[in-house]
């Protein structure tokens, strides 16, 4: 590059001693800058669409946008294209059959007006095959106190659920999901204890705000709303105040109920366990936690429990999309409004359409819902997952 730039200089200006303080010298140097930039862009820079450095720069630029937008959906779209490109002719049919029922998804996760990002999102299409059917895993985790419990849930919960489902008898989804959440909570608790006793792993300790040391670490927890989508059913497990909403024929159907301390049945359970609900900026367990169930939060046990409430919903031809989100969205956007926004974005893309517009529709819906929450002054992290459920309807019609 230096040689090219010197060639441009030699062609446009004869070499001669120049007084660096003179006005003419400054003018000549300024005149050279556009030429050097043009040469660098045209002769040195690699094609933009194949440039890894450009991708890294775009990631840095995007991370500086308001809310630190996490555009994981675009990455997944690129991965899908790459996966399709490397499929050889002999395995095209097999690959198409494997991925034919994978729903299109979009996800957005932003820090919002909070200082720290404590939300986490987990997306694992086709994480399990059972009875020759693909099962898909989606989860949103809203951490509090620190982010490491939510991050641990993102890394491990789908594996725990997979192992439990593989040994599940018939369709005992409620028992299976309760066991999975309890094991996740046990892993989090053991991890915290081992790190304190044996000396924490330094790399993780340095990256954690609470430094994974008691008593701060015992005050860390996370909500968890998880959905396992099969060709026939939608299983939702909820622990905390994140929420899952199904949009069916234009109607918003909540598939989970928020675990708030002042919910009558939760209030009775907390009081029977010997705890109290104190109203301090809203109802809180012992005046501290604004939810009655969560993974982690060892210092509030047995009042705060990790047991999820599980709903199993049969899929129908009228199902349009599933929305999973943290309370950063639901605190300011009603279920019906969220459903309407998602339907509006999906309307332009037909069910079963594999065009770029169809793949971007869910991403647009998640992004628009996030922007709406921020515009309505949401004060929390906002994480949204939108799953297009319409593909199954087209597959049935064509068969």
From Swiss-Prot:
Binding site for Zn(2+): 146, 148, 208, 210
Xref: PROSITE patterns: PPM_1, PPM_2
Tissue-specificity statement: Mostly expressed in seeds and leaves, and, to a lower extent, in roots, stems, and flowers, particularly in siliques. Essentially found in the phloem.
UniProt keywords, alphabetically: Abscisic acid signaling pathway, Hydrolase, Magnesium, Manganese, Metal-binding, Protein phosphatase, Ubl conjugation, Zinc
This protein's name: Protein phosphatase 2C 37
Cellular component terms (Gene Ontology): cytosol; nucleus
Lineage: Eukaryota, Viridiplantae, Streptophyta, Embryophyta, Tracheophyta
Post-translational modification note: Ubiquitinated by RGLG1 and RGLG5 in response to abscisic acid (ABA). Ubiquitination of PP2CA leads to its degradation by the proteasome.
GO biological process: abscisic acid-activated signaling pathway; defense response to virus; negative regulation of abscisic acid-activated signaling pathway; negative regulation of anion channel activity; regulation of stomatal movement; response to abscisic acid; response to cold; response to water deprivation
Domain comment, as recorded: The 'lock' site stabilizes the complex made of PP2C, ABA and PYR/PYL/RCAR receptor by keeping receptor 'gate' and 'latch' loops in closed positions.
Keyword Magnesium: yes
Residues annotated for Mn(2+) 2 binding in this entry: 142, 327, 380
Domain of life: Eukaryota
Site (Lock) location in chain: 280
Function: Major negative regulator of abscisic acid (ABA) responses during seed germination and cold acclimation. Confers insensitivity to ABA. Modulates negatively the AKT2/3 activity, which mediates K(+) transport and membrane polarization during stress situations, probably by dephosphorylation. Prevents stomata closure by inactivating the S-type anion efflux channel SLAC1 and its activator SRK2E.
